[in-house]
């Protein structure tokens, strides 16, 4: 695999359905020994996760990393708060953006890049119910169009 490309481990599809993503930021994760082993095995769940900025530092909450099977007594707490590694400018930008009401930080993807676990954090605004329905209708229409084009080519 060429340097710079990441191997996708987990994706938060629910976040793209529930939120409209305004901007994304790549952040590193501070992990314990058995956590990275579990992540490499793909045993991570981003579904209920979110990020917050506290005292000038970014933290990731409610991301479940399953205990490593061979970890015995050295295993970690699956739902512990994990620190995100960001530059000060990025943190200040996120602080300014999240002061707006209705804007939150959600994890979108976790991947391994150059041997390090990275998380793609999305600056997100919650969708209303009618927005979700509209998106589903649009996807269904696109699917039908692609199906008819595919059938016409045959």
From Swiss-Prot:
One of its GO terms (cellular component) is cytosol. It comes from the Bacteria. InterPro entries: SmpB, SsrA-bd_prot, SsrA-bd_prot_CS. Gene3D superfamilies: 2.40.280.10. Keywords: Cytoplasm, RNA-binding. It is found in: Cytoplasm. Signal peptide: none annotated. The keyword Cytoplasm applies. GO terms for biological process: trans-translation. GO terms for molecular function: RNA binding. Its main location: cytoplasm. Belongs to the SmpB family. Required for rescue of stalled ribosomes mediated by trans-translation. Binds to transfer-messenger RNA (tmRNA), required for stable association of tmRNA with ribosomes. tmRNA and SmpB together mimic tRNA shape, replacing the anticodon stem-loop with SmpB. tmRNA is encoded by the ssrA gene; the 2 termini fold to resemble tRNA(Ala) and it encodes a 'tag peptide', a short internal open reading frame. During trans-translation Ala-aminoacylated tmRNA acts like a tRNA, entering the A-site of stalled ribosomes, displacing the stalled mRNA. This is SsrA-binding protein. It comes from Enterococcus faecalis (strain ATCC 700802 / V583). The gene is smpB.
